Every structure is written in C-alpha cells, then in structure tokens.
Amino acid sequence: MAGLTLDAGALIAYERADPRIREILGTAFRRGLVPTVPAVALAEVWRGDARDARVARLLKACSVEPLSEELARAAGRLRRETPGAGTVDACIAWGVRRRGDAIATSDIDDMRRLLGPGVTVLRV
C-alpha cells in the first residue's frame, strides 16, 4: 500500500482496541507509513473528553488532513457522480483517491462504491 487512510470507523475500532485495526496499523508502521486521518473523520469521533485519550495518542503518529476548499469541491463532484453518497465519506474517498492510499473502514460497501476498483479497502 502506498499509504493508509483511517476513517471514523477505523478510529472507533482503535478506540475499542479492535485487533483488526491494530494489525493494519502495525503493518503500516512497520512499513514506515504515516497514516492519514481526514479532519472530517476526526470530527465524527472526537468528543472532547477522557474517552478521546486512545485516539489522541494515535493522532501523534498520524497526519491529519484538513478540509480545504479544493478537497470540498472535489468531494462535492464525487457525491454528484455517486448517488446516495454522504458528504463525509466523499471527502474521505477523494483524499484516498488523490494519495493512492488504502483505506481502513467499517463502511466497506459505501467506500467501495465511492472509490471504485483498484483501491484497497481494509475492513475493521
């Protein structure tokens, strides 16, 4: 994998110490990858209290991708091309496409629909 993006489902899985996300991240870190966490995914899981501690530690080893105007417009076009796609998923998917990343997600079907063939979608 060229890179790894974590969506909200992956962050929640990490928060819950799910072994699948731990394995995915272990592989990424051994390969020297710095996972990307889209800011919109972080916004979906962050609560601003003690429950965020595990995710906060993970973020120290990740790159948080801001939602730029360019990304927002591209995600809007992707939503238009993918009926039923959600805004957050489209923002995440566009970044994955642009970077050529694999994605760790619990939202397999929607991400596959948005990303199309050729993108590695890892279930958490």
Regions picked out by a protein language model, each given a short descriptive name:
Residues A61-T82, I108:
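Acidic catalytic patch
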Residues R31-V34, A61-S63, R97-A102:
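Short active-site oxyanion
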Residues G48-R51, S106-D110:
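Short, polar loop motifs at secondary-structure junctions
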Residues M1-V37, W46-K60, V124:
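Short, well-structured N-terminal submotif of metal-dependent ribonuclease cores
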Residues A10-L11, A41-L42, L71, I92, ...:
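Alpha-helix capping/helix-boundary segments
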Residues A56, M111-P117:
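Short loop/helix-cap segments at secondary-structure boundaries that form the rim of catalytic
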Residues V45, G86-A102:
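Acidic, metal-associated active-site segment
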